[in-house]
């Protein structure tokens, strides 16, 4: 294996192993920031040694052993003599690992026994509500996604120093607030889980419909969010909304190839070539949706949105779509989590089921909603309805307004093209 091949292997190992490595270390040292530093130290050692010695049989255990030994050395060097660190130092000293194949195999088995609980703790800490939404997203992608600061910055079109500052501030806040490395108690589990799901779906949505930049989609973010969702579903198998979110992301991701034209232009749902949809992802999404439904209880917002996505997925042509069922699902979603955006989406479904005038009446009733004042999809939807009603001049004005409100270049180009197609 060449040095280049080894470095590629190390990158792949790091992306897979870093979340459980950081999670295991965080449990040991009780500090997420220190845990990441130790994991990075282990990575540096691997980069130095593996090109000569080769990638070990149990790379995750090797990295954990190296990181634990590094923790002992760091504690000694910093002379942390208070009782807590003395106890921690003795605990780690008792666990000091000689990096041999036998010890790595033993450690790998031990990690497998504890990795689920540790990962779940890391998920909840990374998405803790004491952090801002931006910090939660950045920290989650860094600690659980294995992304570098540069990769996160590139994905969100944000300067790298900005992302670095968010991550540093997040780790400092967790330490200052003494956020425990634990799974929340039952009384607060629902609220904390909602925060986790929000972060994962924010990551997915930024990949699925980029809010800014020159690309309409950033598939890498969708893949990162899907991977995090699948991991969470394995760790919390009895939480229906987790399976609902996974179902929603799987089904939406299935359309990725069909959503973008050969020149990068957006292709709207009803215009997509459904033969290009990924039916493996659809089947996985339907399985996850069934799992959410089997667990019972009130359907949450993610499960309901997944059920709506499933209506589209089950229709082999746009004409086969059961729009009445979609309207009914939006009715339920509006009762469960009322919001102007849900009402706007419901109005779109009503327009297909009952005609554009019925939809326009609903959309016009939303025109005064403060939450939609600068939301580009409101004039975009209204423009589409006005066009169908033959009110072309008004439609052109609405498409132009929508174009002025979006920060995505592809979306803007599509809206301006729709406006220009109406003359004037």
Feature annotation, model-predicted:
Residues 78, 86-134, 142-151, 158-331:
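Amphipathic helix-loop-helix modules that constitute alpha-helical solenoid scaffolds
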Residues 245, 249-252, 305, 309, ...:
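"A position-specific structural signal for the A-helix of alpha-solenoid helical repeats
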Residues 2-23, 33-36, 190-198, 202:
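A short, charge-rich alpha-helical start-of-domain segment used by transcription regulators
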Residues 14-32, 45-49, 124-128, 209-212, ...:
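Amphipathic, Lys/Arg- and hydrophobic-enriched alpha-helical face
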Residues 43-47, 57-86, 91, 171:
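Σ70-family region 2.3-2.4 aromatic/basic alpha-helix that recognizes the −10 promoter
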Residues 25, 35-46, 66, 170, ...:
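Short, small-hydrophobic-rich alpha-helical interface motif
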């Amino acid at each position: 294996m060449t040095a280049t091949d080894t470095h590629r292997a190390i990158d792949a190992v790091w992306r897979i192993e870093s979340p459980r490595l950081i999670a295991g270390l965080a449990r040991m040292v009780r500090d997420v920031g220190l845990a990441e530093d130790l994991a990075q130290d282990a990575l540096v050692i691997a980069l130095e040694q593996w090109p000569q010695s080769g990638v070990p049989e149990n790379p995750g255990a090797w990295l954990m052993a190296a990181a634990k030994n590094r923790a002992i050395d760091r504690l000694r060097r910093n002379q942390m003599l208070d009782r807590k660190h003395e106890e921690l130092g003795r605990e780690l000293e008792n666990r000091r690992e000689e990096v041999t194949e036998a010890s790595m195999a033993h450690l790998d088995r031990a990690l497998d026994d504890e990795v689920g609980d540790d990962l779940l703790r890391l998920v909840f800490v990374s998405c803790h509500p004491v952090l801002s939404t931006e910090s939660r997203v950045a920290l989650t992608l860094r600690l659980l996604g294995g992304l570098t600061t540069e990769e996160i910055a590139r994905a969100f079109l944000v300067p790298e120093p900005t992302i670095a500052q968010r991550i540093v501030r997040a780790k400092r806040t967790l330490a200052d607030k003494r956020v425990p490395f634990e799974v929340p108690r039952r009384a607060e589990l629902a609220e904390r889980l909602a925060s986790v799901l929000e972060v994962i779906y924010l990551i997915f949505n930024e990949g699925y419909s980029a809010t800014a930049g020159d690309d309409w989609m950033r598939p890498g973010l969708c893949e990162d969010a899907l991977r995090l969702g699948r991991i969470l579903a394995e760790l919390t198998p009895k939480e229906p909304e987790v399976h609902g979110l996974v179902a929603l992301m799987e089904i939406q991701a299935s359309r990725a190839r069909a959503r973008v034209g050969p020149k990068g232009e957006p292709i709207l749902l009803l215009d997509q070539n459904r033969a290009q949809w990924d039916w493996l992802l659809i089947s996985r999404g339907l399985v996850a949706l069934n799992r959410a439904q089997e667990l019972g209880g009130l359907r949450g917002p993610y499960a309901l949105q997944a059920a709506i996505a499933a209506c589209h997925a089950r229709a082999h042509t746009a004409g086969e779509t059961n729009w009445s069922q979609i309207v009914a699902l939006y009715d339920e979603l509006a009762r469960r989590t009322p919001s102007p955006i849900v009402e706007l989406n419901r109005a779109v479904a009503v327009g297909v089921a009952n005609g554009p005038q019925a939809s326009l009446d609903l959309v016009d009733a939303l025109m005064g909603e403060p939450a939609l004042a600068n939301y580009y999809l409101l004039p975009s939807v209204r423009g589409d309805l006005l066009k169908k009603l033959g009110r072309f001049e008004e439609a052109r004005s609405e498409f132009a307004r929508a174009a002025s409100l979006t920060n995505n270049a592809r979306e803007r180009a599509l809206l301006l093209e729709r406006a220009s197609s109406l003359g004037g």
